[in-house]
Amino acid sequence: MSHGIHLRAVPYDHPDALKLDAQVQLEYQERYDGEGDATFLDPAMFVPPAGLYLLAYDASDTPLASGAWRAQDHNDEGYSDGDAEIKRMYVVPEARGKGLARRILAELEADATAAGRRRMVLETGDRQPEAIALYLSAGYSLSEKFGYYRAYESSRCMAKPLRTPTTLS
């Protein structure tokens, strides 16, 4: 699937990002009995170097997938200094199973590392087994709950330490 696929950083309020965000919200509503993701997000949260919003496009410039990270530091929602929180990972149904989410995830991790973040964190839910499988296979492990959904039984929080870039001697 990678042939003709390209990743592009866009603002959170870009029309293609809004289109995919609406689709992921519908999927959340289907999986979680009418509830979408109510986490407050602001476009400024994804402006480099404090975050990044990526879209994957096919050769016809159709948006197929999204993913983002935003900087988090110690606060009353359970984050730690140096955290980079993954948000809005989504692949349209017809493009699933072809490595797009893994490719976006790797790019988000690399960008967060370059921005000096020390740990990637994310919230997903128990009704998203394919997301949980992706994150486990990419080196994430279950962590203490944090964020907006930390009190929800269905919430699954995960974390992965980021490797700091090595310097050449």
Please provide the spans of the model-predicted regions:
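Acetyl-CoA-dependent GNAT
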Residues: 3-87, 92-94, 105-107, 111, ...
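C-terminal "cap" of GNAT-fold acetyltransferases
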Residues: 12-13, 54, 118-121, 125-169
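Active-site acidic-Proline motif in GNAT/NAT acetyltransferases
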Residues: 92-94, 98, 126
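Short coil/turn segments at alpha/beta junctions that flank glycine-rich nucleotide-binding fingerprints
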Residues: 98, 114-118
